[in-house]
Amino acid sequence: MIWHVQNENFILDSTRIFMKAFHLLLFNGSFIFPECILIFGLILLLMIDLTSDQKDRPWFYFISSTSLVISITALLFRWREEPIISFSGNFQTNNFNEIFQFLILLCSTLCIPLSVEYIECTEMAITEFLLFVLTATLGGMFLCGANDLITIFVAPECFSLCSYLLSGYTKRDLRSNEATMKYLLMGGASSSILVHGFSWLYGSSGGEIELQEIVNGLINTQMYNSPGISIALIFITVGLGFKLSPAPFHQWTPDVYEGSPTPVVAFLSVTSKVAASALATRILDIPFYFSSNEWHLLLEILAILSMILGNLLAITQTSMKRMLAYSSIGQIGYVIIGIIVGDSNDGYASMITYMLFYISMNLGTFACIVLFGLRTGTDNIRDYAGLYTKDPFLALSLALCLLSLGGLPPLAGFFGKLYLFWCGWQAGLYFLVSIGLLTSVLSIYYYLKIIKLLMTGRNQEITPYVRNYRRSPLRSNNSIELSMTVCVIASTIPGISMNPILAIAQDTLF
C-alpha cells in the first residue's frame, strides 16, 4: 500500500515537472530555436540508430551536419534583433551571445567532416561520437546565453562531460585513458573551485543569482569592495583558468592533446576556447564591474605567462599534437588581451575577429594532421620531412595554416593579431602588447622549422613514413580534404577583406 502511494506521488511529480518544462518550451521555445534544432537532431540520431543497421552510416553524418547548418541559419536570421531575456531570467539572447554561438556551431560543422575517415579507419562507434559532439555543442550554446549562476555552472558541465567521454573514446588506447583521467580530475577540481567562487558571489549579493541582479545586490548590501568579492574573484578566475587553459593552469592540455583521438583534439581545441571566452567575458564584466582593476591584473599575469611559457615550451616538442597544445596556450594569451580591453577600444571585436581566424587556422592544421596520421600512423614532427615530394597539396595546406598561426602577412592570422595588438596598445597595455609581439616572432621560428621539414627534398632526410606514403582509397577522404580546403582558404582570404568582418564583430555589444 505504501509503495503504491509513493509510486502515485512519483508519477504526479514527474507529470508536473514535464508540464512545467512543456510550458516553458511553449512560451520561450522561439528564443532558443537554434538550440531546439540541435535537440531535434539528437533525438533523430537516436531514433535512426535504434531502428536501422550500420549501413545507414551516411545518414548519421547528414543529420548531424544538417542540424548544425540549419541552426547556423536560424542564428543568422535572428541577427540584430532586440536583446531578449527568457526562461524567467535564466537565458539572454543578444548579438554578443549569438556571435559566440555562431563560432561554436562553425567549429562543430567543420569538425564532423574531419572525423569521417578517422572513424571508419579506427572502427569507432559513430552514433555515440556524433551524439557527444552535438551535446557538447548544445552545452556551449546554452553557456553563451546563460544569464544566471546556475545555468552558467550547468551548461559548461554538459560540455565538459561530453569532452571527457570524447577524449577517452578509444578505450583500448592507454594514452587516451591516461589523458581522460587527467582531464576528468582537473576538470572536476576546476568545477568545484568555480562553484565555490559562485557561492561567495551569491552570499555577498544577498542571495541573487542573475548576473545583473548580482550587481544590484552588491550595491544594496555595500559589499562590492568587500574581501568576500576578492575571494570570489580569485576562485572564479582559477576555475576559469582551467577551462581556458592559460599558464599556469595548462597542465592537462598537452597530455589530452597527445592522448585523445585527433578529430576530438581538433574539436576541443577550438570549441572549449570559444565557450570559455564567452563565459569569461560575461562573468567578469558584469558581476565584477566594481573590481575591474583587480581582474584586469589577474588576467594580465595569466596572459604574460601563457604567451611566454606556451611559445617557449612549443619549441622543444617532438610531437605535432603536443606542439599545437603549447601553441594553443600561447594563443589564448593573445585572446586574453581582447578580454582585458573589453568594450572600450573594440577589445571584444578584436577578440572575436581573432578567434574566428584561429578556428580556421587551427582546424586546417588538424585536418592536415588527421590525413597524415591516417596515411602514415605517426605524429612525430621529424616524420613530416619531405612530405612535399609525395603530397604537395597537403604540404602546402599545412604550411599556409602554420604561417597564419605564426602571424605572417598577408595571411589572416597577421591581420587578426595586428588588430588585437592595436586595440591593446590603444587601451594602454603597452607591456602586454610588447610581450605579445616578441612571442609571436618566437612562434614563427618553430612553425618555420616544420615548414622547412615539409619542403626538404633530399633523400637522406626523407623518413620511411613519407617514402612509403600512400593516399587513402576511402571515399570519405573527400570530406576531410574539403574541410581542409575551406579552412586553408579562410586562413588566407580574410586577410585581404577585413572590413566586413570587423564591422560585424563591432556590432556584438552587450
UniProtKB/Swiss-Prot annotation:
Compartment(s): Plastid, Chloroplast thylakoid membrane
Main location: plastid
A GO molecular-function descriptor: quinone binding
Reaction(s) the record says it catalyses: a plastoquinone + NADH + (n+1) H(+)(in) = a plastoquinol + NAD(+) + n H(+)(out); a plastoquinone + NADPH + (n+1) H(+)(in) = a plastoquinol + NADP(+) + n H(+)(out)
Annotated InterPro entries: NADH-Q_OxRdtase_suN/2, ND/Mrp_TM, Ndh2_N
Pfam families: Ndh2_N, Proton_antipo_M
Membrane topology of this protein: Multi-pass membrane protein
GO BP term, example: ATP synthesis coupled electron transport
Source taxon at top rank: Eukaryota
EC number: 7.1.1.-
Transmembrane annotation, as ranges: 31-51, 59-79, 99-119, 124-144, 149-169, 183-203, 229-249, 295-315, 323-343, 354-374, 395-415, 418-438
Gene Ontology CC entries for this record: chloroplast thylakoid membrane
Keywords: Chloroplast, Membrane, NAD, NADP, Plastid, Plastoquinone, Quinone, Thylakoid, Translocase, Transmembrane, Transmembrane helix, Transport
Described function: NDH shuttles electrons from NAD(P)H:plastoquinone, via FMN and iron-sulfur (Fe-S) centers, to quinones in the photosynthetic chain and possibly in a chloroplast respiratory chain. The immediate electron acceptor for the enzyme in this species is believed to be plastoquinone. Couples the redox reaction to proton translocation, and thus conserves the redox energy in a proton gradient.
Family statement drawn from the similarity comment of this UniProt entry: Belongs to the complex I subunit 2 family.
Subunit details: NDH is composed of at least 16 different subunits, 5 of which are encoded in the nucleus.
Protein name: NAD(P)H-quinone oxidoreductase subunit 2 A, chloroplastic
Organism: Sorghum bicolor (Sorghum)
